[in-house]
């Protein structure tokens, strides 16, 4: 059934790993029955067929850049679809962080507020990802690309569906700065990106 395959692909694009889908289908087999589960396992095997072992892909991505991937970004996990990582590079004068996104991971729409100054600068350092402002088309980001985000602009950024992505996030100094986290990026918005 192609509709089930679509749901499996959506799960993969939203960060569900091969190991996690195997656990989910194993659990479901006790309720739906093993014959149906085996059919689901075959479809899942097709969807995750070209996926590298996550540890190998992560190690290859780390080798593409000089900055550390960092630790799982658990403090902000509720504002992300998929797994992100955070490495603090500097907190003096200007905050600089390396943010890494697993394939398909992206943050929610958000706004960097400021009374004066503020905003954020993104510098892509490895992989491939996207940045999008509200009511504008998404912009593909590759190593060396730089995005200047003024304060008060609603936007999101994250990895391409099948590629790791890392960017430096530079906090632009300002007065009265704060972040407002908004809704997740709609699947129809993200789903058209490759």
Model region roles, listed by residue range:
Residues 1-60:
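Hydrophobic alpha-helical segments
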Residues 7, 110-114, 155-157:
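Histidine-centered divalent metal-coordination motifs
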Residues 57-97, 108, 178-194:
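A short, N-terminal "cap"/entry segment at the start of jelly-roll beta-barrel domains
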Residues 92-94, 102-106, 128-129, 175:
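Short, charged/polar surface micro-motifs in flexible loops or helix N-caps
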Residues 101-104, 141-162:
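Conserved metal-binding segment of the jelly-roll/cupin
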Residues 106, 116-143, 153:
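A short beta-strand-loop-beta hairpin characteristic of the jelly-roll/cupin
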